[in-house]
Amino acid sequence: MIINNVKLVLDDEVVHGSLEVHDGRILAFAESQSRLPQALDGEGGWLLPGLIELHTDNLDKFFTPRPKVDWPAHSAMSSHDAMMVASGITTVLDAVAIGDVRDGGDRLENLEKMVNAVEETQKRGLNRAEHRLHLRCELPHHTTLPLFEKLIDRESVSMVSLMDHSPGQRQYADRSKYRDYYQGKYHLTHDEMDRFEAEQMALAATWSQPNRQTIAAMCRARRIALASHDDATEAHVAESHQLGSVIAEFPTTLAAAQASRQHGMHVLMGAPNIVRGGSHSGNVAAHQLASHGLLDILSSDYYPASLLDAAFRIADAEDNAFTLPQAIRLVSQHPAQALGLDDRGVIAEGKRADLVLAHRRGEHIQINHVWRQGKRVF
């Protein structure tokens, strides 16, 4: 396959030319046009490496499209997969939550179904993107470690993150924000919220630190990429580094992001944060970290189409020094490096032909075609 007349977004430059794919790999590219009649005309669009998503909880909404509605697993997985490739994502880590902040939630009911759906569809070759698992461990819960121990040795597990959403911790250092969020989410009265908050603090006191230490040790022993989550202080970051974290997910302050970089961790922020212009919870904005040169990886989080959109917005912004190739690395090469996937994430000879052809229509980035290992999947 030859793709002609495209702007190739390489590691550190953009060149106008053509690219040839053979046997699922990039055979060659050139700053010239192919004259072969079978070459696909890219019509001057951008040819990018396939996007790599490390943290999406998009799968949840297809398994439970409405409260108490349970959707068939393979149908849910197929719909989720279609949305991923339509967003230019060719490698996706589906984030599944281990443990829940409230007994009786949908997370535990869906966990086994989601894990099995990801693995079965991947093994059977039904997915258009390559799907792996990201285990999001809610530390202050008695069910977290037993569930984690059942899943950690599954072949599809590529990443683990350590979360603590208890009152006064990380994202909820301001306990009034904690109360506002969970009281609204669960429709609690003031008395019910008081009891819920007390219960969560008791659970955190019992389970958070033992689970944090044990899960981190198990990841180190297996060389599975470990991520912190919502670190707010230099002390949080120092602890995360000591535990072996290589990724800092969503640091909530500039100080935490700076400390994460100093400790050699990849700083990951949400692409919706870039598109919307700030954090929905009032934390440090991703564009602020970009302007300080502290942004390494973007994740679509809860909105898959935000990933490529955010990369182009960063390249366009005047308050940072990112070129387009550098911005595209945030959604391709850098996440690949964080996971040790050295066969993808960049347009280079010998790499996997995971590719995205996109055009700019005014301020909108339109994805026209997507290939995974040289096969067109969108």
Mark where each language-model region is:
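His/Asp/Glu-enriched, well-ordered alpha-helical/loop segment
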Residues: H263-N273, G277-A358
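Histidine-rich, glycine-flanked metal-binding segment
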Residues: M1, L8-L48
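Glycine-enriched alpha-helix->loop->beta-strand junction motifs that scaffold or abut catalytic
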Residues: R154-S158, S240-I247, Q262-L268, G293-D296
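Metal-coordinating catalytic core of metallo-dependent amide/deamination hydrolases
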Residues: G99-D231, D301
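Metal-associated gating/positioning segment near the N- to mid-region
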Residues: G45-M114
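C-terminal cap of metal-dependent C-N hydrolases
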Residues: V6, Q333, Q337, E349-F378
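Active-site glycine- and acidic-residue-rich loops that bind
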Residues: L135-P146, D230-A235, E239, I247-E249, ...
